């Protein structure tokens, strides 16, 4: 599918054993698309493919209902293994993500500022950092610009940032934008 809307439509209209879903879709965040697919077909396994850092997006994808998360740079090595594992009823995480999760368990429970954000606040952060206006973000998330403004205010407060320039700098420095 070339878009979130098309992916959701195809899943609703057809029967699939498994869905491979790109986290970066042109019309909507892949995590939001995943949530919609899981609302429609909760038992359908979905493996997320992404070019984004696993430690940033892998956990969010798994929490949203993904059965697996594969980074595109290693997809040729891991995809067959991931599909087999998910089709056998288990979840799949890459060795790199497993290592990151194990390391974080041993570290202090202090989270990085962006890890405190809700999914919508996180989406807002990424889109603001990418240069989108409040109106463009509202259209992308199918919400009002006023709601986007509330998300922006919350993320600024939670992350102790002052403006969109600081948001963009933070997102770039932490690998949260393309």
Q: What is the role of each PLM region?
A:
Residues 56-63, 67-119, 123, 176-177:
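Short, flexible helix-to-coil linker/hinge segments that flank and couple to helix-turn-helix
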Residues 1-3, 10, 161:
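Short hydrophobic/Thr-rich beta-strand motif most characteristic of the beta2 strand and flanking loop
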Residues 26, 54:
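The feature encodes the CheY-like receiver
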Residues 3-6, 29-32:
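Acidic catalytic/metal-coordinating carboxylates
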Residues 12-16, 36-44, 64, 174:
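Conserved phosphotransfer cores of two-component systems
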């Amino acid at each position: 599918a070339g878009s979130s809307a098309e992916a959701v439509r195809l899943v609703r209209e057809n029967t699939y054993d498994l869905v491979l879903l790109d986290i970066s879709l042109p019309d909507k965040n892949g995590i939001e698309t995943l949530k919609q697919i899981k609302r429609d077909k909760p038992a359908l396994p979905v493996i997320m493919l992404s070019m984004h850092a696993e430690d940033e997006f892998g956990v969010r994808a798994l929490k949203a209902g993904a059965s697996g998360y594969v980074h595109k740079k290693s997809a040729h090595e891991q995809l067959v293994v991931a599909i087999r594992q998910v089709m056998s009823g288990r979840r799949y995480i890459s060795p790199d993500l497993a290592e990151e999760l194990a390391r974080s368990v041993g570290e202090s429970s202090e989270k990085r500022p962006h890890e405190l954000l809700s999914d919508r606040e996180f989406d807002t952060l990424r889109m603001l950092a990418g240069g989108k206006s409040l109106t463009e973000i509202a259209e992308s998330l199918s919400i009002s610009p006023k709601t986007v403004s509330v998300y922006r205010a919350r993320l600024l407060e939670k992350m102790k940032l002052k403006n969109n320039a600081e948001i963009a700098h933070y997102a770039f420095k932490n690998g949260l934008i393309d």
